[in-house]
Amino acid sequence: MSRGALIVFEGLDKSGKTTQCMNIMESIPANTIKYLNFPQRSTVTGKMIDDYLTRKKTYNDHIVNLLFCANRWEFASFIQEQLEQGITLIVDRYAFSGVAYAAAKGASMTLSKSYESGLPKPDLVIFLESGSKEINRNVGEEIYEDVTFQQKVLQEYKKMIEEGDIHWQIISSEFEEDVKKELIKNIVIEAIHTVTGPVGQLWM
């Protein structure tokens, strides 16, 4: 039995990640695919993250970084098991978000990546570009919904994309929604059909 593919959607806040994930979920047989999003706010770490994001509690940046990382590690075994059972996972945010947001706040990218080292490695990361309209919508109640901060996050994403050690697909914000939907669906289907070998380890 061939394994499932680990496909991650990344991008700035309000870039359309969840919408595109749901489009994929509707396009592929339900018995072969599952959706997972981070942070998972139902766990102990997730509830602490939710309190932080919604400004109910404050933590120093190092603690916040570790909380987000721990939240992903809580699901590392689940991800590995699902992939080995032939289930493809569509993941809304992953380690790259954690590293980009931490680095945008001044943390060492190298150190932040070391916390995530060993997580299941994605077979494909789809990065949704944000147009000026989407970026300017980044004003909201949660702590990271700030235009200036989101621009910093974007620069950190670009650094990771340029490293070339991960298979990234950048989706332009210039595409019409129906074109974007079809393009992403085709990219995902190809990734599922061409995945080979054991699940890799991220940043090892």
Curated annotation (Swiss-Prot):
<keyword id="KW-0808">Transferase</keyword>
<keyword id="KW-0418">Kinase</keyword>
<comment type="pathway">
    <text>Pyrimidine metabolism; dTTP biosynthesis.</text>
</comment>
<dbReference type="GO" id="GO:0006235">
    <property type="term" value="P:dTTP biosynthetic process"/>
</dbReference>
<dbReference type="InterPro" id="IPR039430">
    <property type="entry name" value="Thymidylate_kin-like_dom"/>
</dbReference>
<comment type="subunit">
    <text>Homodimer; the dimer arrangement is orthogonal and not antiparallel as in human enzyme.</text>
</comment>
<comment type="function">
    <text>Poxvirus TMP kinase is able to phosphorylate dTMP, dUMP and also dGMP from any purine and pyrimidine nucleoside triphosphate. The large substrate specificity is explained by the presence of a canal connecting the edge of the dimer interface to the TMP base binding pocket, canal not found in the human homolog.</text>
</comment>
<keyword id="KW-0547">Nucleotide-binding</keyword>
<dbReference type="GO" id="GO:0005524">
    <property type="term" value="F:ATP binding"/>
</dbReference>
<dbReference type="InterPro" id="IPR018094">
    <property type="entry name" value="Thymidylate_kinase"/>
</dbReference>
<dbReference type="InterPro" id="IPR027417">
    <property type="entry name" value="P-loop_NTPase"/>
</dbReference>
<protein>
    <recommendedName>
        <fullName>Thymidylate kinase</fullName>
        <ecNumber>2.7.4.9</ecNumber>
    </recommendedName>
</protein>
<keyword id="KW-0244">Early protein</keyword>
<dbReference type="GO" id="GO:0004798">
    <property type="term" value="F:dTMP kinase activity"/>
</dbReference>
<comment type="similarity">
    <text>Belongs to the thymidylate kinase family.</text>
</comment>
<keyword id="KW-0067">ATP-binding</keyword>
<dbReference type="InterPro" id="IPR018095">
    <property type="entry name" value="Thymidylate_kin_CS"/>
</dbReference>
<keyword id="KW-0545">Nucleotide biosynthesis</keyword>
<dbReference type="GO" id="GO:0006233">
    <property type="term" value="P:dTDP biosynthetic process"/>
</dbReference>
<dbReference type="GO" id="GO:0004550">
    <property type="term" value="F:nucleoside diphosphate kinase activity"/>
</dbReference>
<dbReference type="GO" id="GO:0006227">
    <property type="term" value="P:dUDP biosynthetic process"/>
</dbReference>
<dbReference type="Pfam" id="PF02223">
    <property type="entry name" value="Thymidylate_kin"/>
</dbReference>
